Amino acid sequence: RKAILKQIKAALVPHLRAEEKIVYNGIYAVKDKEAKQDSAEGYMEHQLAEKMLVTLEHIDNAMSPEFSAGSKVLKEMVEHHVEEEESNVWKDVKNHFSSEQRVEMNKRFLARKKQVEPAAA
């Protein structure tokens, strides 16, 4: 279970950080109160997910009820976050950025994610 947690963290943290830097900061810069709210909510959800990862790392017994419960909470948080992104954040991106801007944003996201990966492991 700890090995799986390490893999989850190695995949999730670079994604979170790149998304915050490129997507959420981009959305937050537009003049749309609702889009800014969506961006702020996403950022807060990222912070909570990272805190849960740290909490799980500090539980010595990966077979304990605490580790199982924490893993379940993390899973539910990530699922909720993905649903919010699909219904709100990506709508905001589509509404406020041209196709060319979205392509550029994706390139910057992927580049940023690669920069974060070594530090997140």
Positions of predicted regions on the chain:
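Small-residue-biased structural context
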Residues: R1-A121
